[in-house]
Amino acid sequence: NENYSFTLYYFRNIYLEKKLISTIKIIRDKQIGNPFINIPNGVLQQGSNINKDRIIFDNEISSFLVKIKEFNVSKYPITEYQFLDFVLNNGYKNDNYWSGSGLEWRNTNNIQNPLYWLHINNVWYRTHNSFIFNVGSNLPMCNISWYEAQAYCKWKNVRFINESEWEYISTNLGKNNYPWGDGSPTNELCNINNKYKYCVDVNLYKCGENTNGVSQLMGNIWEWCEEVFYPYPNFTIDYIYREMSYPFFGEKKICRGGCFCVNDYLTHPKYRNAQDPGCQIQYIGFRVCLKSS
């Protein structure tokens, strides 16, 4: 069953400066494509109203109607393999790909490559726990800041998905509670509840796709959206969770979808997360859309 088949790893040791630094897992994947999927126009009732059947936070309320224009979105989040191409093409060194705020963040923090990546003997590796992995797998690119994702988009001449578009495809064009229908999320439908302790290949969990074939919208990694985090119309502070949202309006960037270590009750297309655009330590990645002609 492809939902439970995982990449085979081969092991060898590597020495750096005459010291054993780790066991490398050499990933021998067949690289998959990441095609764009056409999404028709429609309407979305974005956000939530009070519902006793699930936990709802104040930043989801209240719902409002949005018209969605036709767009084309990547089937999967951008993979490690795809992002490696950006790195190899001097994406971190070419100022033309970086916005003003992104450039300031990159230079101030001396960002020269993705977090946890190492360049050894002209080969890129990624560290995770006690292992070092060859970079270039079908895993989703994660631990990536909004600024880095923005630079990738500029280099590739694509754009971020926006928050309304993301919720639209994650609710089957506004028709269901989840991409796969109305059933609650489980470990069989998406990578959640920390079952596998890390993200998995983007081509797994076919049964969790939406009806258009967009994959892994729930779980595995959070996904950056284009917008700054702002309240919905008629927002009212929930004083039980009063520190969750309003202190960060106008500062953080939206991210959606949950990740492998998020509980099922927070894995929902309406749930809004937000992080600083320079955040790299969270398991956040991104998917992209074609620019309108």
Which ranges hold each PLM region?
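Functional-site microenvironments in short loops/helix caps that host divalent-cation chemistry
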Residues: N1-I61, G91-K270
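C-terminal catalytic core of Y-nucleophile DNA break-rejoin enzymes
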Residues: V66, F71
